[in-house]
Amino acid sequence: MSQKQYRVAMIGAGKIVQVGHIPNFQSLTNVTVEALCDVNEERVKAIAKEKAIPRTFTDYKKMLSEVKPDITVIATPNVFHKPMALEALAAGSHVLCEKPLALSYADAKEMMDLATSKGLTLTVGSHYRWSDAIRAAKAQADAGFFGEIYAVRTVWHRRSGIPGYGSWFTRKDLAGGGSLLDIGIHALDRALFLMGYPQPLTVSGATFSKLGPQGLGLGGWGADILKPTSNTQFD
């Protein structure tokens, strides 16, 4: 029996799309990447040419209307996730949205409700849960190796300063928040994933800005990205 073929369109042509989504989707035998959309026309055309993607757009609504993709990847500044996902779902497309799914619970629920009502999949790019370390820890947790897990503390160590200073990642009007929405969401996902996504009884959190202003614009994102290790701690 032949595999079902899926046509993919992507909104956003940043680094995660270039080094992650495009090559990984193109490696699948039953998937074709049909179109790429970005507001930077020069960049999107150059990337599409390099990656052998046949069509480019600067208007995602036009892309959804003309391409009619089976799957839409959304990798744009966080503030645009909700409207773009709703448009893609309304057009009948499954959606893979970069984290965070939305900027509020109410917005996320609206997106999930629409996906459910249309029988479509809406998923989030929480890729750290698929790392070798987390998958091994999950297998051990499911096998009962840790006993009853009733509390988890998850920690993310990162250098001081603000890597990428000046980009949309550091602009609240586009990112919707700070480090909690950016890297904190991965830490929370790891903890909840390892525990089987229980319903939390209490939640507390804190963020600190004391270290942030040091070393403005110094270097890149650091060496923690995509390392096959986990800082999740079980207390």
Provide a role label for each language-model segment.
Residues M1-K51:
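N-terminal Rossmann-like dinucleotide-binding module
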Residues G12, K99, G144:
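Conserved G/P- and acidic residue-centered "switch" motifs that form tight phosphate/ATP-binding loops
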Residues V17, I74, C97, L122-V124, ...:
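Hydrophobic residues in well-ordered beta-strands that form the structural core
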Residues L28, K51, E66, S131, ...:
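Acidic-histidine catalytic/liganding microenvironments
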Residues V31-A35, D70-T72, G178:
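Short active-site oxyanion
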Residues N40, K51-L114:
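Beta-loop-alpha module in the N-terminal Rossmann-like domain of NAD(P)-dependent dehydrogenases
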Residues A108-H127, F146-V152:
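Rossmann-fold dehydrogenase core element
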Residues Y128-T232:
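Predominantly a Rossmann-like dinucleotide-binding segment in NAD(P)-dependent oxidoreductases
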